[in-house]
Amino acid sequence: MENMPPQSWILTCFCLLSSGTSAIFHKANYSRSYPCDEIRHNSLVIAECNHRQLHEVPQTIGKYVTNIDLSDNAITHITKESFQKLQNLTKIDLNHNAKQQHPNENKNGMNITEGALLSLRNLTVLLLEDNQLYTIPAGLPESLKELSLIQNNIFQVTKNNTFGLRNLERLYLGWNCYFKCNQTFKVEDGAFKNLIHLKVLSLSFNNLFYVPPKLPSSLRKLFLSNAKIMNITQEDFKGLENLTLLDLSGNCPRCYNAPFPCTPCKENSSIHIHPLAFQSLTQLLYLNLSSTSLRTIPSTWFENLSNLKELHLEFNYLVQEIASGAFLTKLPSLQILDLSFNFQYKEYLQFINISSNFSKLRSLKKLHLRGYVFRELKKKHFEHLQSLPNLATINLGINFIEKIDFKAFQNFSKLDVIYLSGNRIASVLDGTDYSSWRNRLRKPLSTDDDEFDPHVNFYHSTKPLIKPQCTAYGKALDLSLNNIFIIGKSQFEGFQDIACLNLSFNANTQVFNGTEFSSMPHIKYLDLTNNRLDFDDNNAFSDLHDLEVLDLSHNAHYFSIAGVTHRLGFIQNLINLRVLNLSHNGIYTLTEESELKSISLKELVFSGNRLDRLWNANDGKYWSIFKSLQNLIRLDLSYNNLQQIPNGAFLNLPQSLQELLISGNKLRFFNWTLLQYFPHLHLLDLSRNELYFLPNCLSKFAHSLETLLLSHNHFSHLPSGFLSEARNLVHLDLSFNTIKMINKSSLQTKMKTNLSILELHGNYFDCTCDISDFRSWLDENLNITIPKLVNVICSNPGDQKSKSIMSLDLTTCVSDTTAAVLFFLTFLTTSMVMLAALVHHLFYWDVWFIYHMCSAKLKGYRTSSTSQTFYDAYISYDTKDASVTDWVINELRYHLEESEDKSVLLCLEERDWDPGLPIIDNLMQSINQSKKTIFVLTKKYAKSWNFKTAFYLALQRLMDENMDVIIFILLEPVLQYSQYLRLRQRICKSSILQWPNNPKAENLFWQSLKNVVLTENDSRYDDLYIDSIRQY
C-alpha cells in the first residue's frame, strides 16, 4: 500500500465510494414490503399480493408470513423454490392465475412441479381455482385441510390423486366439466374412501351422472348440484350418517327461461329419488332440491329428517304440492322453506292455494313464495300461516299480484319482513282499486352480470330482501316495483306497526299533503326513490312524526320543469329526521324559501343536483340554502356541476360539519383558507374535480382534518411543508393525479403524525435519481401504508416506463456529497493527465535540456570551446538498418571523402566515436566538432529517439552559436506534414536533398551535397526571408 502509485489510490477511492453508495441503495430497495402488502392481524401475518401482475412468486416476502394471497396474477409455474423461504405458511391463494381470457399468455395453464409444496409442513389451505389444471397436483403436504380446484379442466379423480391427503377436510372440485365439457367427469371407485377426515366435498357442475360410491362417513356437506344425476338410489347416501348439508339442485333442471345453458332430462322428467334415499341422513339440516323438475314430494323422503332446518324447492312444478303439502307434516324443525318459481306454464291463477299442513311448521321463520303467479291475495288465504309462532319473513315478490288485502298480514306475532316487490299492486283511493292502471315503465328485473359465481347458488340469492339499514328500525314492508302511483288514506290500513317502508319504482306522481301515511304513523325509514313526486305542499310527511330516514332520490321529473312549484319547506316539520337523501333530482330552483331548515338533520345527500345554477345567481339568493341546518354533520354535494364555489356560499355552510363531500364536480380552484371556519371537519372529499393547487401548509386552515380525498384531479406537485403540522391527518388520497415528483420536505412533519394511509397509485413519476429522496422517506416511514404500491409506477425515462418505483434500481445513483467528491477527484485526475500530456508535447525538449544542463553544472562540467572543428560533417543515420549503413559507407563516404576534387572529412559513428564514452557524450562531441550535421532519414529512423536527440543537439547550436548546421538527406518520403521541414524548405531549400529515383541524376545529387557541405547555409537563404528579417 505504501508503494501504491497515485493513480491506483484514486481508482481505489472511486471504487470504494461507488460500492458504498450501491450498498446504501441496495438496502433501501427491500426495507418496505414490495410488491406485496404485509398486514398483521392477531397471530397472522398476511401478505396481500393479489392483482399485482406478477409472473412468479416474489422472493422478497418476509419469512414470518402465514397467509399469502397471490390471486389474479399471471403466475403459471410453481417450483420447489417458489415457497422455499416461507416455511410458516398456513394458507396459499393462487386463484385466477391462468385465466382462459389470456390464452396467449397461459396456453397450457398452471404448471405445478411434483412436490413443489411438500416442504410446507404447516400448510392447511390451498386455493387453486380457475388455473386450467388438468389434474390434482401431486406431492401435496399431508398437513393440508382445505383444497379448492374449482373451475379447472380436471375430468378425472383417481386414488393416486388423493393419496397422501389423509388429513384433508374440505375438497372443492366443482365447475370442472359442465358447460363446455363433452365428456364424463370420472371418479374412480373409492377415490375418496381414504380421506377419513373429509367433511366438505363439492362436485357440483360436473358431468357425473351418478353419486360417487364409497364416500367417507366423515362427510358433513356434500354438493352435487348440476351434475346431470337422474337417479338417486337407496344406497347412494348410506354410511353418511354425519351429513348435515346435501345439495342436489339442478339435476334434471327446469329449463324454462333459465339464465344459463340448460339441458332438461328426457321428456322434461324429474329427478328420480328412491323413497328411502335419505333414510340414513338423520343429522341433515339443509336440503336443496331446487330445479329438479319435481312434481310431487313423497313424505317418505323426510321420515328420518326431523332435524331439517332449511329446505329449497324453488324452480320446480309444485303448485299442487303447495296445495296438498303432505310432506310438511314430517318437518317439525324446518325454519326456512323456499317454494319460489313453481308456477305452471301459461297459467295466471286467481288465488294462491296454501295447504293447511303449513300450520304444522311450528319452527318456520322464513317462507319464500316468489313466482307462484296469482292475481289476488285475501286474508283467508293466509289463515294457515297466522298460527305459526316464529314466522318472521314472508316473501311474495314477483307474483304479479294485482289486488291485495293488507289485513292478511295481521295477526302474525313475529312477522318482521313483508316482501311484495315486483307485483302489480295498485293504488286504493276511497275504497276504489286502481289495479287496472298498469305502469309499464318499471325497473327491469334483470342482472348485469355476464359471469356466474361458482360460490353462489344458482337458484336462490343469499342477499337480504330489504336493506339492513331499513330493517334495523323494525317491521318492514317492501312495495317497490308496483303500480302505487297515488297513495290513498286507506291504502295501508292494518299496518300501524310498520317502521320500514319501501315504495320505490312506483311512478308515483302525487303531491303529498300530510295525510297519506296517517295509518302508518310509526314509520322511521321511508324509501320513495325513483318516482315522480311533486313537492308542492309544505305539509308533506307531517303525519310521520317518528320519521328518521327519508330517501327522495331520483325524483327529478317535476324538478326539471321550470314552471312547476318546488317546495322543500316540509323538512322543518320533521322534528326527528336525521338522514335526508335528495340526490339526483336536478334541483336548480326552489319556490319561496331559499333555505332548508331543520334542527334534527344530521346527514344530507344533495348530490346530482344543480348547485352551479343555485349558487351562481347574481343576487346570491341561495348562498345560505344549508345555513339553517344547525346540527348537520355530513353534507354530500357531489356531482353538482360546480365550476366554482362562491366564498359567501361556502361560509354559509353549517359550522357543525364533520364530513363534506364535493367530489365529481368541475372545480378548478378551491379556497383552502375558508376551512378554518369549520373546526370540527374530519373528512373532506374533493376527488374527481379539476384542481391544480394545494396549500403550502394544510394544517394552517384545517387542523382537525383526518381524511382528505384528492384523487382524480390535476395536482402535479406537493408544496414544501404541505403536511408539516398536519398531526391529525390519517388518510390522504392523491391517486390518479399528474404528480411526477414528491420531495421529502412535502411529507415531513414537525411533530408526531397520525398519517397511516397514503394513496399514490395512478400517478406517473419521473424515475430519475431525484426520486431517491422520496424513496428514502418511504423507507423511514414504514408505519404508513401505501395501498397498491405496485401500481405507483414510472412514466420516464423510457427504460423505466410502467415499472413500479419500488423496483427502480438506484444503485447507479449517488448522494450530492459523494457526487461532489467523485467529481473533484475525476476532474483533478483528468486535468493533471491532460496538463502532463500538454507539457510533454510542448516543452519536453526544454525540460530535458534544462535538466541535463543543470545536472552537468552540478557535476562540474564546463562548456567546451566549439570554435575548433575537426570534421566537415557529422553523419547521423540508422546504424541498425543494414541497407542504410551500406549506403552511407560505400556511397556517401566514397563520393565525399574519396572524390578527387575537394574531398570532405566526415565523422561516422561506427568509425570515429571514442569507445567507452557514453552515447550522449560521443553524440554531442561529434556535432560540436563538425561544421555540418547531415541527417540521413528513413521512415523508421525519423521516429527513433537517436534522431530526435541528435536533431535537438544540432538545433541547439543555432540557438547558442547562431550557426545553421543542419542538412537533410531523404532516402524515403518522410515528415511530409512536419511544419519545421516545410518552413526550412521555404527558407533554405538547398539544405534538403532527396535521393533521386533516376540513376542518371545521382552525379548531380553528389555535387549538390558537396556544395551544401562546403558552404554556409545562411548564404543560401531565400532573399524574401532575409528582407523580412531586416525590417525588424
UniProtKB/Swiss-Prot annotation:
Transmembrane segments annotated in the record for this chain: 819-839
PROSITE patterns linked: LRR, TIR
Gene3D superfamilies: Ribonuclease Inhibitor, Toll/interleukin-1 receptor homology (TIR) domain
Membrane topology, from the record: Single-pass type I membrane protein
GO molecular function, a single term: DNA binding
Listed SMART domains: LRR_SD22 (SM00365), LRR_TYP (SM00369), TIR (SM00255)
Species the sequence originates in: Mus musculus
Residues in TIR domain copies: 869-1013
Glycosylated residue positions: 29, 88, 111, 122, 160, 182, 231, 242, 268, 288, 304, 353, 357, 411, 502, 513, 581, 671, 743, 754, 783
Name of this protein: Toll-like receptor 8
